[in-house]
């Protein structure tokens, strides 16, 4: 029996093995059994074990390194998550704020588009063109997230009349804070004959009294004596522009005075930076010992030599050659070329700016009109104070926190036009810098000036005047600045407003033709209020962060001001109305 194995092709049987001729069946000697154990194929066992140990150690080290790397990777992920979480939270707040801003901007654009459509429709119809121009000129906007306000003659008075009209003439349901309440009580106590002209019974705040108080605050920055072709506000803006053009870099010159008004925040930022970089200590007051005690103007038209020159703003204007040196600073005659090569020591850049931007063909030499110069420096100081008060203000806080609610007394307010924050946005999230002030000058100051060319700063911002008048003065007198500070809480602040109460009483008496007060008495009372306002400006400018100080000390609560939104409206209107129940 034969078996055929295809792998080896071997035929076997009962007899001898046969090897058929095949490529796999070749003749070769027997293979040595211990061939692969020869020394040539084997090495020292100790060397092999050592190499194995080295390889094992390397593998263990690599494993440990991989384990450490894995642990570090986990810790890095945890650390990154820990650091990213607060950033993500801030980004969420910023995204919310940006969404609110976009909503407000969209609403403002819709409102502007609607207004443009309405104006264009009237223009196309060709009817009442002059009325439309007058109406649009009397439209202002104080904050970005509120609609336009249209007024007749005086924004503060017109809005006040609307407040009382919507309260159905129940005067006791409208309050303006403890400051105005104190003024009215002082008037009733000191001038009972004048008090009969107002309705103060039953705890009411008289509309007549509030209107008179606001107009008195607005008047304290005006010069009642002398004929002048330029207002203090115009002179202040010209000085700011001339200083910016003289000392600034990358200057953009305005094409007209209206564009200069819109650029005032830029000029103020530049002036503030230059004053802060100077080595000398800043002084925002005059030498009161050399000035008249009870009048703003001097009987002879000039103050004592050196009375105004210590003021930091005036010193900066003179040192930068925006204004020429004051009287007596230089001898008469020309200065030698070695000292003044350009012979421009007596050039007046403000007069040149007035000719270029206003073109009234009237010279403007402030150094020759010292009362106007003093009023101009006061206006620049007030503008710097306004710049500090409105820096980084947050108008997008939750509306329910604002005491000033436009929809409470202005009918027909569209909710989409009064956009507030959807959440309570923290004040440190929104950094507005000077954008709210820039908007205020573009949409409030410029339209106001376009309507009334000779308008003064105090007419635009009576609330800032009230803040200056509310600064407590030292017990040494109104003009005493060297009295030491005492830790005494003064609850008799009514006596410091005696000048304002006197001016209000005179204005109320002048409303009756039967009792016409003397002009001299009115001017004297007006000057006393102006001097007190000047003193308050100096005191508030000594504070680096006046808004924070006023909020921390609760001074603003006396005017019904609780938020930055309230503060901006209070500065522009002079009051914050609050409607209360009369039950």
From Swiss-Prot:
Ranges for the region named Interaction with major capsid protein/MCP are 1-49
> What keywords would UniProt list here?
Capsid protein, Host nucleus, Host-virus interaction, Viral genome packaging, Viral penetration into host nucleus, Viral release from host cell, Virion, Virus entry into host cell
> Per the annotation, which location comes first and is thus the protein's main one?
virion
| Annotated Gene Ontology cellular component terms | host cell; host cell nucleus; viral capsid
A Pfam family it matches: Herpes_UL25
Q: Does the keyword Lipid metabolism apply?
A: no
| Origin: domain of life | Viruses
Question: What is this protein's function?
Answer: Capsid vertex-specific component that plays a role during viral DNA encapsidation, assuring correct genome cleavage and presumably stabilizing capsids that contain full-length viral genomes. Participates in the interaction between the capsid and the tegument through interaction with the large tegument protein/LTP.
Q: Which family does it belong to?
A: Belongs to the herpesviridae CVC2 protein family.
Full protein name: Capsid vertex component 2
Per the UniProt entry, what species is this protein from, by scientific name? Gallid herpesvirus 2 (strain Chicken/Md5/ATCC VR-987)
